[in-house]
């Protein structure tokens, strides 16, 4: 697995490949890295449909916002969805996974900084919404995801995510990117999402 030298802990690394050509991705696949993240469903369909047929061990993660009208294109392409943020979306995924006979692993996206411009569940409503989704839909929810505010110190937000995950008894935490992955790792991140540190700014 590539790029784990960034870390003092062994944490699965999702390489964010939004806008990255297959020419640049192929050597990473050839090095046996398996976790890749895409932000947009359409781009992922164009890039990964054939590659995943040829490389069955690859795990593709949707790390961007998922619109309800795109759910039908997500499965079975994406093994992980990191952006469940509403009852309506939960219903769409639940129906589609029955049609496709494929059950992705799912993260609830938490709006940990209470930012109006960002997607995600209000962290104050996380417990109630998670309970309702868990009771109403047969989804494989494994953890929480967040994108903290763009501030110099993101540590308090990761600490809060860690607390929420313990309250909900969810073991997986998808948090930390190129500029703050160390603080995320110190607060129990189980997946980090790195792009610009590998490919440069896009």
Protein language model features and the residues they cover:
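Expand to "…catalyze enediolate/carbanion chemistry for C-C bond making/breaking, isomerization
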Residues: 198-200
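Conserved alpha/beta-domain cores
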Residues: 1-172, 177-179, 185-187
């Amino acid at each position: 697995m590539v790029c784990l030298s960034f870390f003092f802990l062994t944490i699965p690394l999702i390489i964010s490949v939004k806008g990255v050509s297959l020419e640049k991705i192929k050597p990473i696949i050839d090095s046996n890295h398996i976790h890749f993240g895409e932000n947009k469903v359409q781009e992922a369909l164009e890039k990964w449909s054939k590659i995943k047929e040829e490389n069955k061990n690859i795990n593709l993660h949707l790390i961007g916002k998922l619109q309800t009208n795109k759910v039908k294109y997500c499965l079975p392409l994406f093994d992980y969805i990191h952006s469940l943020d509403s009852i309506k979306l939960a219903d769409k995924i639940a129906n589609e996974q029955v049609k496709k006979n494929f059950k992705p692993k799912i993260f609830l996206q938490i709006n940990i900084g209470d930012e109006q411009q960002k997607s995600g569940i209000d962290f104050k409503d996380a417990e109630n919404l998670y309970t309702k989704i868990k009771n109403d839909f047969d989804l494989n929810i494994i953890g929480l995801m967040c994108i903290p505010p763009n501030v110099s110190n993101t540590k308090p937000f990761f600490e809060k995510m860690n607390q929420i995950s313990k309250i909900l008894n969810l073991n997986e935490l998808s948090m930390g990117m190129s500029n703050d992955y160390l603080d995320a790792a110190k607060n129990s991140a189980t997946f980090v999402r790195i792009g610009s540190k590998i490919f440069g700014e896009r």
